Amino acid sequence: MKVYNRDSDIEWVSMNFQVPVNAILREYNTIKDSLNIQRPEYDHKDWYAVTLYGYGSDKTKSHWEYRQRGVKPFLTEIGEKCLGTVKWVRSLPYARIDDIRFLVIKPRGYISKHIDVPEHNWLDPLNISLTYPEGSKFILNDKEVPYKAGASIVLNVHYEHYVENNSDEERIHLVVHGKKNKDFWLQASDIPSAINITQETMA
């Protein structure tokens, strides 16, 4: 089994986490009217987000863009309505959670080509697919990321990437930033496109 870490020279790593897709989507459906337009200053189309844990439900950019001395991330009012989702994320092998967000591309929407953090060439966000309608596409460094509903993949967004939703349904992902503990990478998959979906409710 290949051993990964934050500095591994690779675009993404698929993880073997058991994702309670249906249970998370049930909670998402109770708060979907609270979505905010994501990064309206750029040339994206119908990209939305809401924060469950971070610096405010409408503070939907990456956590480091809001970080201030003496201010810690917190469970937002939206997170209070998605306690099962937050509890599941906290069960993952993280030493610290920095943010938890739903990122949604509406039908026929897209995220334009961009690089998140050019100076940080490392594997960072855990990007979990909850729905991935036919016609969806995630291209990272000119390679298509093997997403399907239930896939949990750590991405290196130092590379240029773009996302398309060429369907009539929402594309819904859950994104987590945080400090991974020593056991995190033990959950990496040997199979790049491995998918694990559980229909169980969240414990």
Where is each model-derived feature located?
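Short beta-strand His + acidic residue motifs that chelate non-heme Fe in jelly-roll/DSBH
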Residues: 112-114, 136-139, 155-168, 175
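Conserved short histidine dyad/triad with adjacent acidic residue
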Residues: 101-120
